[in-house]
Amino acid sequence: MLFLQTARHSPESCPTHNYEAKKVFGTFTAKMESLTKKHGIKVVGSWVSMPEHLVVTVCDAPNQEAMLNYMMEPEIMAWSGYQVAETRPVLTLEEAAKFAK
């Protein structure tokens, strides 16, 4: 099951300039691989638009519960304090096309 996550932070909370955000972001990124593995999640890709302070991530999770449990991990919740994130289930174009037949 694919999930699209968009996360935006303010320039003031950007980890490139905010010391506290940098510490929390460092902890989050250091634990991300073990946390995704713990919940059976594969990060398909993650992209950053630096001028917009926007991060876009696509994850492949076994189900919605796994994704929710991952997002409730303390390191994820701590980083969420510096940004506004939206996570939604998505389909590939090929999967969506089946509904149009």
Regions from the PLM with identified roles:
Residues 78-92:
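Conserved short beta-strand edge segments in small beta-sheet-based binding/regulatory domains
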Residues 69-77:
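Short, intrinsically disordered, mixed-charge
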Residues 1-53, 62-69, 90-101:
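Short S/T/G/P-rich N-terminal loop/turn motif that feeds into the first structured element of a domain
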Residues 57:
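Conserved RNP beta-strands of RNA recognition motif
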Residues 34-36, 77-80:
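Short, conserved catalytic or adaptor-binding loops enriched in Gly and charged residues
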